[in-house]
Regions:
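Short amphipathic alpha-helix with an adjacent loop that forms part of the alpha/beta core around
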Residues: 73-77, 337
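Active-site proximal beta-strand in glycosyltransferases
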Residues: 99-113
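Ser/Thr/Gly-rich flexible loops in soluble cytosolic domains mediating phosphotransfer, phosphorylation
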Residues: 111-121
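Conserved acidic donor-binding segment of nucleotide-sugar-dependent glycosyltransferases
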Residues: 321-328, 337-341
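C-terminal amphipathic helix plus adjacent low-complexity
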Residues: 332-442
Length: 442
């Protein structure tokens, strides 16, 4: 359905859901990225569509709501876009048929995979193209769609907002986490660290509990860079993708999915995982491999950070990143790097340089245009600012088994837990931070 656009800027319609919690950085990034590569961009807030109930016959449900979805589609189509881009995708399905009937491709970005795959696998087939932040979900989505227009695409950064040197460094807490610290396994890591500091270091955990944008202590996107830059060490622990107890009992074991036909080789979760996680709609208990936005944003600011070792993509794309496989190791590395500022800054600069050269939303949006066929190649005017295309486009070839569950972490490779470091020669009694001499391609 996509047509190559040449001789004029591509027109990208952003159908955004402004009410999403923790997606402001994404929404800001897509607009910035498309504009920076020369696209004409216009936004539509489709949040009112969330009132339309979702059902298996979504188009029927939408039509029962009269002109609301049709009106949004008409407004968008009057602008004559080359692509409609829907972040998250859950409510964009109400306009997807109208958009495609007019001959315009519509793509969604699945930003909460694999935690929501029990739902996304049902509505993603209604889009022309699907982009997922986690390659572990690609086989499922391809199987549900019956075609290959499914692509792996990580989050990125808006470097007008997240870049080094713009904010005062290191004046705040020694360690800072920005996000929902109540999600497993973060409490184990951060409570252990909090106990170990015991006055020896200061921590800023924002937030210990689930909050929304109406919360009086809500920290808006404009404040992210200054807050993260204030720390000596950024704290980053990825959520566990394992199915939640509520999802297992209310969605899977209740027979709710009895009418859903899965692709060959896939099956719904049939036994309790070793530990309940945060996959509130992860009905198949799929594993996770992706790197979260927090890593890219903290790194782009030039702030050193410590992450958990449960994500294979972190080990593959950032082999010199410092990771910990358990709370005890997390604490050990926190104090080691707190006491070694020069080594900390050298690691931070390496990570920052790599993010700024390969992982901005300019790179992500350029890749989108290539994948959907609006560009045949990168315009010559952008080649110098984006760098070599092979360095920043995502590989789409991964060996993954549909039998794999979240109880089999994708991140515990040797490179993630036992690499050698070219940067540090720890003295007796210190932990040797992980790293390697390789810079891997996307």
């Amino acid at each position: 359905m996509s047509r190559v656009v040449s001789g004029r800027p591509p027109r990208i319609a952003l159908a955004q859901q402004g009410g999403l919690v923790y997606s402001d950085d994404y929404l800001d990034g897509w607009k910035w990225g498309f504009e920076k590569i020369g696209c004409e961009v216009r936004e539509w807030d489709i949040t009112p569509l969330h009132n339309i109930p979702l059902s298996r016959n979504t188009i029927y449900s939408a039509r029962n709501w009269g002109d609301l979805p049709r009106g949004f589609a008409r407004q968008i189509l009057e602008w004559k876009p080359d692509l409609v881009w829907v972040h998250h995708g859950r409510y964009g399905i109400h306009i997807s048929q109208y958009i495609q009937e007019a001959g315009v491709p519509i793509a969604c970005y699945l930003c909460d995979e694999p935690y929501e795959t029990g739902e996304t696998m049902l509505y993603a087939p209604r889009y022309t193209h699907v982009f997922t932040m986690d390659h572990c979900t690609i086989p499922l989505h391809k199987g549900m769609r019956g075609n290959d227009s499914v692509f792996y695409l990580l989050p990125g950064v808006n470097t007008d907002r997240f870049s080094p040197g713009k904010h005062q460094r290191g004046y705040g807490p020694d360690g800072v986490f920005l996000g929902n610290a109540s999600l497993v396994p973060r409490p184990w890591f951060f409570r252990h660290l909090e106990s170990a500091t015991n006055g020896k270091a200061s921590l800023g955990i924002y937030y210990w509990n689930t909050v929304n944008k109406q919360h009086p202590g809500w920290i808006g996107l404009d404040k992210y860079p200054a807050l993260l830059s204030s720390a000596k060490i950024g704290l980053n622990v990825h959520r566990s993708p394992s199915i939640t107890e509520d999802c297992y009992k209310r969605r899977v074991m209740s027979g709710r999915n009895a009418r859903t036909v899965l692709p060959e080789g896939f099956k719904f979760c049939s036994k309790e995982p070793k530990e309940w996680g945060t996959g509130f709609w992860n009905d198949l208990d799929l594993p996770a491999s992706h790197i979260n936005p927090r890593f890219f944003e903290t790194g782009a600011l030039g702030v050193f950070q410590i992450s958990d070792s449960n994500r294979s993509e972190l080990a593959r794309l950032f082999p010199d990143s410092v990771v910990a496989s358990n709370p005890e190791e997390f604490v050990e590395k926190f104090f080691y790097f707190l006491d070694h500022p020069e080594e900390r800054e050298e690691r931070a600069k390496q990570c920052c340089d790599l993010i700024l050269s390969r992982h901005t939303y300019k790179h992500r949006c350029a890749e989108i245009l290539l994948r959907v066929g609006l560009w045949e190649s990168i315009p010559e005017s952008l080649s110098s600012s984006l760098g070599l295309q092979g360095d920043w486009t995502h590989t789409q070839s991964f060996q993954s088994s549909p039998e794999t569950s979240s109880s089999e972490p994708t991140g515990h490779s040797n490179s993630a837990t036992q690499p050698t470091s070219r940067l540090l020669t720890p003295t007796s009694g210190t932990t040797k931070p992980n790293g390697s001499q390789q810079v891997r391609r996307l």
